[in-house]
From Swiss-Prot:
Organism: Klebsiella pneumoniae (strain 342)
InterPro entries documented for this protein: KsgA/Erm, rRNA_Ade_diMease-like_C, rRNA_Ade_Mease_Trfase_CS, rRNA_Ade_methylase_Trfase_N, rRNA_adenine_dimethylase, SAM-dependent_MTases_sf
One Gene Ontology molecular-function label: 16S rRNA (adenine(1518)-N(6)/adenine(1519)-N(6))-dimethyltransferase activity
Source species taxonomy: Bacteria, Pseudomonadati, Pseudomonadota, Gammaproteobacteria, Enterobacterales
Catalytic activity: adenosine(1518)/adenosine(1519) in 16S rRNA + 4 S-adenosyl-L-methionine = N(6)-dimethyladenosine(1518)/N(6)-dimethyladenosine(1519) in 16S rRNA + 4 S-adenosyl-L-homocysteine + 4 H(+)
Family listed: Belongs to the class I-like SAM-binding methyltransferase superfamily. rRNA adenine N(6)-methyltransferase family. RsmA subfamily.
Superkingdom of this protein's organism: Bacteria
Keywords, sorted A to Z: Cytoplasm, Methyltransferase, RNA-binding, rRNA processing, S-adenosyl-L-methionine, Transferase
Record HAMAP family: 16SrRNA_methyltr_A
Function per UniProt: Specifically dimethylates two adjacent adenosines (A1518 and A1519) in the loop of a conserved hairpin near the 3'-end of 16S rRNA in the 30S particle. May play a critical role in biogenesis of 30S subunits.
Subcellular location(s) per record: Cytoplasm
Name this polypeptide is given: Ribosomal RNA small subunit methyltransferase A
EC class: transferase
Residues the entry annotates as binding S-adenosyl-L-methionine: 18, 20, 45, 66, 91, 113
Length: 273
């Protein structure tokens, strides 16, 4: 028997499809999301409706974004969900979540079992819409969740950690074994809750500057900051900002990166930032 077939659908590798089929895990995720009628619930990658059905049961209306044409068609003709669903058959990476929130008249509650092959770029896409999002609950590769929640001085801490924690409060919810899926992925999974900050703990003037600094620092994570960011900050400036020039990218806190970004915004001509 082909273990990539679930409910008559062949999982497509190019879409990173692994279908959730463990009822205990499904119930735990739905409890964590706690969907309520009247909320603007949006699911990314509903697949074979493992989460869509129990969430949809609690709602009058649910919006879903599904790239796979066959799966979108199945949802359209679903016996009890069909009439409740608004289906966008497109790549979530091309979705304007700000426009969607405007259309729905309130901030979005986004959830999904994200395809692991696009989870990191999709997170960055969603971060640019945090003003339009109330919260997010995602099933991700456990290693990605570890990176999202990691603090300084750990191997898992990187650019994703800094940017996620700049935008959101990040809360791990539960771990999920490969056996909960068809076909089983080769990695462990985990569910994470991301709640966008309503008041930024460390406001920055230009997010693109923070993004630039973290990209340059973590692309050369074995180098000290005086070397990896020497083209942007002198040793004196780093010291003035409370950053030891001899440490590496992984030793610098989110707050310190934000201070560095604000200094750079104030001291670089706009065309350079």
């Amino acid at each position: 028997m082909n273990n990539r077939v679930h409910q008559g659908h062949l999982a497509r590798k190019r879409f990173g499809q692994n279908f959730l089929n463990d009822q205990f895990v499904i119930d735990s995720i739905v409890s964590a999301i706690n969907p309520q009628k009247g909320q603007a619930m949006v699911e990314i990658g509903p697949g074979l409706a493992a989460l869509t059905e129990p969430v949809g049961e609690r709602l009058d209306q649910l919006t879903v974004i599904e790239l796979d044409r066959d799966l979108a068609a199945r949802l359209q003709t679903h016996p009890f969900l069909g009439p409740k669903l608004t289906i966008y058959q497109q790549d979530a990476m091309t979705m304007n979540f700000g426009e969607l929130a405007e259309k729905m008249g309130q901030p979005l509650r986004v959830f999904g079992n994200l395809p692991y092959n696009i989870s990191t770029p999709l997170m960055f896409h969603l971060f640019s819409y945090t003003d339009a999002i109330a919260d997010m609950h995602f099933m991700l590769q456990k290693e990605v969740v570890n990176r999202l929640v990691a603090g300084p001085n750990s191997k898992a801490y990187g650019r994703l950690s800094v940017m996620a924690q700049y935008y959101c409060q990040v809360i791990p919810v539960l771990e999920v074994p490969p056996s909960a899926f068809t076909p089983p992925p080769k990695v462990d999974s985990a569910v994470v809750r991301l709640v966008p900050h309503r008041t930024m703990p460390y406001p920055v003037k230009e997010v693109r500057v923070l993004s630039r600094i973290t990209t340059e620092a973590f692309n050369q994570r074995r180098k000290t900051i005086r070397n990896s960011l020497g083209n942007l900050f002198s040793v004196e400036v780093l010291t003035e900002l409370g950053v030891d020039p001899a440490v590496r990218a992984e030793n610098i806190s989110v707050e310190q990166y934000c201070k560095m970004a604000n200094w750079l915004s104030n001291n670089l001509p706009s065309k350079e930032s």
